[in-house]
């Protein structure tokens, strides 16, 4: 029986697992039932299972043969604070939470690969199956690393995969170098002197200073970053005042910036600091600037050459050369798998969730993972393990 036929038999199981996880979404560091479900499945496959890294993380270990080669495969588990608007039977049962980024599918594909590999054992070495919490803005990968992930599971390399709605169903996209941008937040607090709206001359208007600052911030990329280097700075929140006839004392601005190099990241941070200081001084406004006040920023997701070559070989074996884009445009989105790639060589790859006009973008209340790609993704994981570790002697 061929690999694809075997995975097709697993397909119905993976669909059941995926839709179960979709019905019961759990957000960052609260994935207790999700982790238990995954751990129970891994144990039933005969894997050694460790729980608790990164609070709710799960790692399954499968060793075959006598080789000391090791590979780690990672899937994320967490959902988002989004109210699902789908009406199908497996829609979210948790109000205000849903799997709008496909992490239910990522977990199901990795579980399918774990089951197949545990039953067929056609490799020589050790596979670590990492199920990570809190990818969505809470840096769960970093927390697992801090808790000793790679000390306890000393892999040679680490690999990740994410569904992508803009790619045709079951095709892949991967390349060496930057795949996802770095991500940093900032918060600016401007403090002036409150006054009656009819008497602005008696106060210092923090709203006026904030307006000038917002406009100036948009010059950072357009007039300071080399046009050949992609970057974006966005103001995403403005908080000030509570009534019609008073100029408030305080304005709070929040935003993000994203790019693909440390040099550009440093330049943006420096220019932000410069603008905040000088514009607010010019308006006689006090100001503070804080970077990443709630969570760690994410580094660039950067694929290393040898590991990308392995991922590319596996993807081509699954989808054919015509089914693999080897020069995709990097995404301005961000991914905390980047923390793992700072610790170990590895590769992050996209699998197509479907590019038709009926497919939803990620983080959309109508999104649903495409179950058609479950067997394709699991097959990619299996091929990657067999290529990287080789057959047992």
Question: Where does each model-flagged region fall?
Answer:
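Active-site pocket-shaping loop/turn-to-helix segments
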Residues: 24, 201-208, 263-269
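Non-cysteine beta-strand/loop elements that form the S-adenosyl-L-methionine
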Residues: 72-74, 186-188, 348-353
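Divalent metal-coordination and catalytic microenvironments
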Residues: 21, 60, 73, 103, ...
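Active-site beta-loop-alpha junctions enriched in small/polar residues
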Residues: 26, 76-78, 134, 164, ...
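Histidine/acidic-residue-rich, glycine-tolerant segments that coordinate divalent metal ions
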Residues: 59, 80-82, 86-98, 104-105, ...
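Acidic/His- and Gly-rich active-site-bordering loop/insert found
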Residues: 2-99, 108-123
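Metal-dependent amide/peptide-bond hydrolase catalytic core
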Residues: 211-393
